[in-house]
Amino acid sequence: MSSLYTLWQQFYPPAPTFTEKDVGAGSQVGKVFIITGANSGIGYALVKLLYPTGATIYVAGRSPQKIQTAINEITSVSPSPSTPATLKPLHLDLDDLTSIKAAAAAFAAQESRLDIIWNNAGGGYPVGSVSKQGIEAHMGSHCVAPLLFTNELLPLLRAAARTAPKDSVRVVWTGSAQIQLNAPQGGVDFARVEKPTTHDMQDYGAAKAGNWFLAVEGARRWGKDGIVSVCQNPGNLSTPIYDIFGWFMLALIRGLFLYDAKYGAYTMLFSGFSPEVNKGTNGAYIWPFGRIKPPPRADVLQAGSEGKAKEFWEWCERSWKKHV
């Protein structure tokens, strides 16, 4: 598959075939979800899609004020759905590893199960950025912190899997077309992961490749517990991540290839609920707006299947064990 063709397929994907119509009103009563980065962008759009389902949804993010504003906006919809979800705030700062266990403990104090977590949060960082623990900023917030958070919640995922329908308990990671465009050879360059950001898009692409590695290794480790772990590229979407551009450039790229955030939420909806995502496709990579395909670069696919996913997972574990 040529690189131009795969880019075209990611930048201009076919229409979604799995939408909110496939996750009916009231269908998720009794289920508990976490969506990180849910006060804006794709995460916010996903909460809106899931609001009629009756689930309990934790809207996780760094700013309590923005989280509450998002919850107020979504719950004020008129007319109200017949089985509205219960939306709860969860403070989570992925730039600071010392806050992660507290966030997981706050969730566990309220819930006895977790059916799906969408590890969606994570933006771009300028050159020179590091997390509060000195990890390259993209790696810290997109990979190390989300893996720690998910690991802390693992007992609740396992608890849900014991009684939930087969293959319905899922961990959803977030990839990007930047894996193809900017990730280093083999996906992750371990010589750069503990240094400040040296190239914003290359380091972002490496972190997104890291997310797929975590999905692959998560599938290997958690599959026996009935947990499905996948990585999805939501697509090129009009979200706050592009606000760094001036108005002219922003208008140009929106006109060329940015879709409404709702379309990215459809990719996430597919990843969380489609029957195509199951034990047989555990560890899969999902293209916009809901298509299971291999990652678009052969070297990244090869690295993930030849032990680099395990190596990356273990590096993430060592990184947080130094600090928490």
From Swiss-Prot:
Residues of the active site: 204, 208
Documented applications: Iso-A82775C is a precursor for the biosynthesis of the anticancer natural products chloropestolides A to E via a Diesls-Alder reaction with maldoxin. In the absence of the prenyltransferase iacE, siccayne accumulates instead of iso-A82775C and can also be condensed with maldoxin to produce chloropestolides H to K, which show also antibacterial and anticancer properties.
Keyword Membrane: no
Binding site for NADP(+): 42, 66, 93, 120, 204, 208, 239
Molecular function terms from GO: oxidoreductase activity
Coiled-coil zones: none
Pathway given in the UniProt record: Secondary metabolite biosynthesis
EC number: 1.1.1.-
Keyword NADP part of the UniProt annotation: yes
Induction: Expression is co-regulated with the other genes from the iso-A82775C biosynthesis cluster and probably controlled by the cluster-specific transcription factors iacI and iacK.
Keywords, alphabetical: NADP, Oxidoreductase
Consequences of knocking out this gene: Reduces slightly the production of iso-A82775C.
Family that this chain belongs to: Belongs to the short-chain dehydrogenases/reductases (SDR) family.
Function comment: Short-chain dehydrogenase/reductase; part of the gene cluster that mediates the biosynthesis of iso-A82775C, a enylepoxycyclohexane and biosynthetic precursor of the chloropestolide anticancer natural products. Within the cluster, the prenyltransferase iacE prenylates siccayne to generate pestalodiol E, using dimethylallyl diphosphate (DMAPP) as cosubstrate. The probable oxidoreductase iacF is then involved in the epoxidation of pestalodiol F to pestalodiol F, which is further converted to pestalofone A by the short-chain dehydrogenase/reductase iacG.
Protein's UniProt name: Short-chain dehydrogenase/reductase iacJ
Source species of the chain: Pestalotiopsis fici (strain W106-1 / CGMCC3.15140)
